[in-house]
């Protein structure tokens, strides 16, 4: 079981200070790498449809998956034809790019990809090479906008809009790896189009074995539960359950962990509540104690207004360019 070092989220710490020189070196490398793309010394893949990148500048969960689900479905509801590309973290398929379906194996294409596909109404492709994923998507589907899931640092993929998400831990101690949780200097947020705070709303709790069997949120006030999370920020999940009144026995696992039945061999009969991403990998277990806690992203109205105005203008501009107007 792995989790982010505590000193990443402390303003001052001995270990953070010791690692600061390495963070400075890391920042230099990041700036040089990004600069090479900016001046054209490294190739950027460009496409005839808008590319919207959703990501963050911190290590760990920032609510990207629920947000991408919301964004893809909202685009579809407003008449767009979206598609999603992702790296497919944890997937071990021998062939990429690969189109994700509802029946895809999380072991092959990654847990997040399977969760996304079960909750969005649009095509999705996974590949380590994001540009190859977009090419495959556009070759096989009639998409007019592409969402890049967790691609903020993949500069080789051209983009028209960038959305950075921030979770409840914000930027931690403000330092880059390894002294802090930042993948890029915090000044990077000044270059993105939108910074959106993570906000998740509880949706429902249902049994994995029989999804029709649900637990009312009010029932949690009387329950002691095992909370199991193999996500980037398990603490947020545990706090959500505690806020709903549950007495939580926390079990954090490393991100993208693939569970075995013995991982749930607890010495009692308390219910076991999992995140949606974890539940995707546990449906094969014949265990009536396993329940899934599903959530929805809550997105600010101002962002929605600004984003859809911008994306509509970008689509019109790109159409005009293709038609030579």
UniProtKB/Swiss-Prot annotation:
InterPro entries in the record: LpxK, P-loop_NTPase
Catalysed reaction(s) here are:
a lipid A disaccharide + ATP = a lipid IVA + ADP + H(+)
Pathway membership, UniProt: Glycolipid biosynthesis; lipid IV(A) biosynthesis; lipid IV(A) from (3R)-3-hydroxytetradecanoyl-[acyl-carrier-protein] and UDP-N-acetyl-alpha-D-glucosamine: step 6/6
Q: Which GO terms describe its molecular function?
A: ATP binding; tetraacyldisaccharide 4'-kinase activity
UniProt GO cellular component terms:
plasma membrane
- Which EC number(s) does the record attach to this protein? 2.7.1.130
Purpose: Transfers the gamma-phosphate of ATP to the 4'-position of a tetraacyldisaccharide 1-phosphate intermediate (termed DS-1-P) to form tetraacyldisaccharide 1,4'-bis-phosphate (lipid IVA).
Protein name per its UniProtKB record: Tetraacyldisaccharide 4'-kinase
């Amino acid at each position: 079981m792995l989790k982010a070092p505590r000193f990443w989220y402390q303003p001052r710490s001995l270990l953070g200070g010791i690692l600061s020189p390495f963070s400075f070196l890391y920042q230099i490398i990041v700036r040089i790498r990004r600069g090479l793309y900016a001046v054209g010394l490294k190739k950027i893949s460009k496409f005839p449809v808008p590319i919207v990148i959703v990501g963050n500048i911190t290590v760990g969960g920032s609510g990207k998956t629920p947000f991408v689900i919301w964004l893809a479905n909202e685009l579809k509801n407003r008449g767009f034809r979206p598609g999603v590309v992702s790296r497919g973290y944890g997937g071990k398929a021998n062939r990429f790019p690969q189109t994700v379906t509802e029946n895809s194996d999380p072991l092959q294409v990654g847990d997040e990809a399977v969760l996304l596909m079960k909750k969005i109404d649009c095509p999705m492709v996974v590949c380590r090479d994001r540009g190859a994923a977009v090419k495959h998507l556009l070759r096989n589907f009639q998409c007019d906008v592409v969402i890049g899931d967790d691609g903020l640092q993949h500069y080789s993929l051209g983009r028209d809009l960038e959305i950075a998400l921030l979770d409840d831990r914000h930027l931690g101690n403000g330092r880059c790896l390894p002294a802090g949780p930042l993948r890029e200097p915090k000044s990077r947020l000044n270059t993105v189009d939108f910074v959106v705070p993570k906000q998740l709303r509880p949706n429902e709790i249902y049994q994995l074995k029989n999804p029709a069997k649900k637990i009312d949120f009010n029932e949690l006030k009387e329950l002691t539960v095992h909370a199991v999370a193999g996500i980037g920020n398990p603490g947020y999940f545990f706090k959500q359950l505690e806020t709903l009144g549950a007495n939580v026995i926390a079990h954090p696992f490393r991100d993208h962990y693939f569970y075995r039945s013995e991982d749930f061999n607890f010495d009692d009969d308390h219910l076991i509540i999992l995140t949606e991403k974890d539940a995707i990998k546990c449906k094969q277990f014949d265990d009536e104690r396993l329940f899934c806690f599903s959530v929805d992203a809550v997105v600010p109205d101002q962002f929605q207004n600004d984003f859809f105005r911008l994306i509509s203008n970008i689509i019109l501009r790109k159409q005009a360019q293709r038609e030579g107007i």
